[in-house]
Amino acid sequence: MKAVIQRVSEARVEVDGSTVGAIGRGILVLLGVEKGDTERDAAWLAEKMAGLRIFEDDAGKMNLSVREVEGSILAVSQFTLAGNCAKGRRPSFDTAAPPDEGKRLYDRFVDLIRETGIPTATGIFQADMKVHLVNDGPVTFILDTKSRSSST
């Protein structure tokens, strides 16, 4: 799984002109599921999202998690994160999980986040979505479950 995470002061996702998910302060997660990803990847990523200290404390250091600042998470599926632009001019999506598997693991990731008690909003899987955000910082990170160490 690949995730682009952004610390936001607010974010929302629209489908057909209607807001389907919105948060205030928190994390926007753009999530791409690849072939070979498992529930273990979803669990690792959900745990990482809940505990990642990317919010500033009183001293101005990134030392607080989304839970500690009583923030929320907006999770948006984005299969294009599995795209490969190394050859030619058009991306290849050969490594993207099939839609049914991608949806199953995306839904599992969302369920695991919700189980932590962090308020979580979502987009709609496979919909044409418009994502609006105010990136706070800006603070943006890229996580790939394939590059995690065995100790995390």
Curated annotation (Swiss-Prot):
Q: Which GO terms describe its molecular function?
A: D-tyrosyl-tRNA(Tyr) deacylase activity; Gly-tRNA(Ala) deacylase activity; Ser(Gly)-tRNA(Ala) hydrolase activity; tRNA binding
Q: Entry's InterPro entries?
A: Daa-tRNA_deacyls_DTD (IPR003732), DTD-like_sf (IPR023509)
User: EC?
Assistant: 3.1.1.96
Membrane-spanning parts:
none
* Pfam families according to UniProt: Tyr_Deacylase
Note the SUPFAM superfamilies from the entry.
DTD-like
Q: Where in the cell is it found?
A: Cytoplasm
Sequence motif Gly-cisPro motif, important for rejection of L-amino acids, residues: 137-138
Q: What does this protein do?
A: An aminoacyl-tRNA editing enzyme that deacylates mischarged D-aminoacyl-tRNAs. Also deacylates mischarged glycyl-tRNA(Ala), protecting cells against glycine mischarging by AlaRS. Acts via tRNA-based rather than protein-based catalysis; rejects L-amino acids rather than detecting D-amino acids in the active site. By recycling D-aminoacyl-tRNA to D-amino acids and free tRNA molecules, this enzyme counteracts the toxicity associated with the formation of D-aminoacyl-tRNA entities in vivo and helps enforce protein L-homochirality.
Q: How does it assemble?
A: Homodimer.
Question: Which NCBIfam families does this one have?
Answer: D-aminoacyl-tRNA deacylase
Q: What is this protein called?
A: D-aminoacyl-tRNA deacylase
Gene from which this protein is expressed: dtd
